[in-house]
Structures are given as C-alpha cells and as structure tokens.
Amino acid sequence: MQLNSTEISDLIKQRIEQFEVVSEARNEGTIVAVSDGIIRIHGLADVMQGEMIELPGNRFAIALNLERDSVGAVVMGPYATLAEGDKVKTTGRILEVPVGRGLLGRVVNTLGEPIDGKGPIDSDGFSPVEVIAPGVIERKSVDQPVQTGYKAVDSMIPIGRGQRELIIGDRQIGKTALAIDAIINQKDSGIKCVYVAVGQKASTIANVVRKLEEHGALANTIVVVATASEAAALQYLAPYSGCTMGEYFRDRGEDSLIVYDDLSKQAVAYRQISLLLKRPPGREAYPGDVFYLHSRLLERASRVNAEYVEKFTKGEVKGQTGSLTALPIIETQAGDVSAFVPTNVISITDGQIFLETDLFNSGLRPAVNPGISVSRVGGAAQTKIIKKLSGGIRTALAQYRELAAFSQFASDLDDATRAQLEHGERVTELMKQKQYAPMSIADQSVSIFAAEKGYLKSVALNKVGDFEASLLSFMNSEHADLMKTINDTGDYNADIEGELKASLDKFVETQTW
C-alpha cells in the first residue's frame, strides 16, 4: 500500500495532536548523611521550610534546616533502611492530616492514620497542620462557659469557650485526671473533644481510651497519639495535628475542646531535633524559638465570630460563632514554675490551674491551689448561678490558709477567728471530688449554696462528704424540677434562692447523713 505525501502529513499531524506530554518537574536530591532520625540532603535547590520530602519506600521527611549547600530534614518514622546516596524528591506541599466527623471515636497517630484496629477513617478531606491563627478582627470575646464538672475549677477558676487554660504541676498529681474528667463532662454538651497524648507510655494511653469509652465520651472525642517510643518528629508534630482536627469544628460554627498532654514532652522532643540539626542551644539547652513553638500552637485556640464562620463555610453556616478551647498541660520539676518552658506557657495562656504535691499528699483531690491559680478571661463566661454563689469561696479558702498557718503558733483564738478556720476547713473538705465523677451545674450550685449559707456549720468535718452525697441524692429525687431548671437555665434569682433555702432547711431536719 502506497501513501501519498498528503496522507503522511495528515497522519503525522493527527499523531502530534493526540500526543500527551505527562511530565512532572520535581526537584531531586541525594542523601549525604543519616544519623539519629536526621538526614542531610544535597541538591534540593527550591525546597521550602516545613515541606514534605519524599524518601524511598513511600516515607517522608520534613525540611527544617535550609542551609547554603544542604538541607537538614527530620524523618517521619523509622530511618534504619535509609542510606547515603539514596535519591529523594520535593513534593511541593507541607504536612496535611485528615479532618472531619469520621475521626470522632477513633485513635489516630500524628499523621491521622488509625491505630485502633477499627478500619479506615471516612474523613472530609485534608488540612495542613501549620496554619496562621485567626486575627484580632475575626475573633469574638469569650462569654460562654466550658463546664469541667469540678467544683474547685468551675467556681474559682472558670474556663470559657475559646480560652487557653494551663494545667500545671508535678508528675502524678492529677493533671491528666482533671483534663479527662473535663472531656467526660462534655459528652452531652455538644462540645467535640480532641485529646493529644505526647511522649506517654502506650499502656497509659490505652487506659485513658478505655475510661473514655466506659463513660460514653469516646464517641465525642478524637485521640491523637505519639508515644514515648515514636520518633521525636512525630512527638513534636502531634499537637499541631490535633489542633488542625479541632479547628475543623471551630471553623464550621461549632465548639471544640483540645487537651495537650503534655507540652513539656513536646518541647523536649523539639529540643532533641534542634540539637541534632546543630541549631545553637539557649537556656536549658532549648533552641531560641521554643517560645514560638508553643505560641503559634496556642494562639490557634480562639473563639471566632459569625462573619469568620460564614466566610469559611462560603455562606453555608450563618449567625453561628465557633470556638476551640485549649487545656495545655505542663509538668514541673519539684514545683518549679519559674523554669523556662513553664514560664513561657504561663505567659502565653489566659490563666493556669496550679496543682500542688503537698495538697495532693494531704488528701485534697483535685489538688488545686486557689491562691496562685487564676482564670484571666473565664469570669465573663461563668454560669450566672455559680458566679453569684461562689464569690465567697475563694476568699474563705485564702483566709483559711493564712489563719491556719498563723494558728499553729497561737495558743488561744477568738471566736471570730475560730469560726473562720472552721468554715475554711469545711469548704476545703467540700472541694474534694472523686475522679470520673464530674458534677452538673445544679449539683455544684447546691453544694456551694450549702457552704455559703452556713449549712455546714453543724456538720462534723469528717461528715462533710457524706452530708454532700445525701444532700444531692435528696435534691435530685425530691426536687428534680428545681435541679432541672438550674441545669437548663443556669439562672439565679430570688425565687430560686428561696426554693433552695426551703429545700435545704427540709433536708437538714431529716438528719439523714
């Protein structure tokens, strides 16, 4: 068969038109050194800070040091099989994690991959772990409460939606217990929770997950895990991953709560990475940007206004504000709050709950020291009835502490001083609370009302706990309507005060404790 020149040119033209060029221009480099989870790469000219670098075997590293002739990157996971001379590629994107409602009730690692054996996660998409916090104009003032269920916290150190409240204290004195109870208390409040475990034992995290499940709070919670045995890079990035998952709800006009347990271990992981990258060490061998490490994370916790939510959702959600409340945890050494990381985080947050070893050992749990614990913005968000009733609680405890120290040296005390001491002792006893037993607004209100109005005067100190338990049982069975009204409205007026007084008078007559 012979083809003429026209047919040949048409055929060539057709082939040219159908030809598709599928090429991907990606920068490629070579590993020149591997040690302790850090790789040095030569030849990556246009890599950006924080960019994911593709390694052999479908693994990734993150570029942290951009130097004149090499790039320092930290490997996300095991690095034993990496060798000098291996080829790596830039990806043009920073680390992203899955977000969405499909993550609720699941346990995931830093990268958002499920580790609970419940199958794949149905996410709504991916979001970058590092984003800029909302600006001042996009924020709204904190004026709605987050109930922790602890009398000592909700009455004296109230937390608002969108606040950052630090939980600080030595090891093994109930920091995690307080945060977990706060999560358990949100199971019916509509607040979605994220629990980020950094540098902890796997057995400890398994116990926390089991307790959340037992109390029906896991279905409302995302657990992000970077155990002590995992790479320092994963421990450093875990809080940012959890924050991104919490922001998903905030940006859609919902309320969320995130617990970072704990940021001391994250700072240690970051120090390890920085020293291996040969960055110059500063105070306590931490790098110069360890303040920025925590500030850029905690500034993302905020309450955003309705305009921000409407703009973010492209008009799908209107007239609703969103919030992300943060409870960062910091572990101190021998009660030293003046160390580098504790002072940094205290200055970033909107208040702190200080837990004290001596109080814990004396049997006061939660071991909250009301003298140096403070909430800078939560007062505006406090429930009305708790705010009205709890005004004298902090004062009573502060006076009691002062007088208790003084009375050890005084041989005889006048009646007024003795009355103050006895009242303080009973209020201190009333503030004790069991773990995994968060209290409703009504229960807290009744207990505080009893203390404020002098109903504990005639109760023996060792019977205060029994008195409270019997009182709450009586109120919830005999005056369920009143308790429901308080829980629903949180209001306090002359009618409610009168009803509470009549109910307590009736209970005291029964002498059933």
From Swiss-Prot:
Belongs to the ATPase alpha/beta chains family. It comes from Shewanella pealeana (strain ATCC 700345 / ANG-SQ1). Keywords: ATP synthesis, ATP-binding, Cell inner membrane, Cell membrane, CF(1), Hydrogen ion transport, Ion transport, Membrane, Nucleotide-binding, Translocase, Transport. It is found in: Cell inner membrane. The keyword Cell inner membrane applies. Signal peptide: none annotated. Pfam families: ATP-synt_ab (PF00006), ATP-synt_ab_C (PF00306), ATP-synt_ab_N (PF02874). The keyword Electron transport does not apply. Produces ATP from ADP in the presence of a proton gradient across the membrane. The alpha chain is a regulatory subunit. It is a peripheral membrane protein. ATP binds at residues 169-176. Its EC number is 7.1.2.2. SUPFAM superfamilies: C-terminal domain of alpha and beta subunits of F1 ATP synthase (SSF47917), N-terminal domain of alpha and beta subunits of F1 ATP synthase (SSF50615), P-loop containing nucleoside triphosphate hydrolases (SSF52540). This is ATP synthase subunit alpha. GO terms for cellular component: plasma membrane; proton-transporting ATP synthase complex.
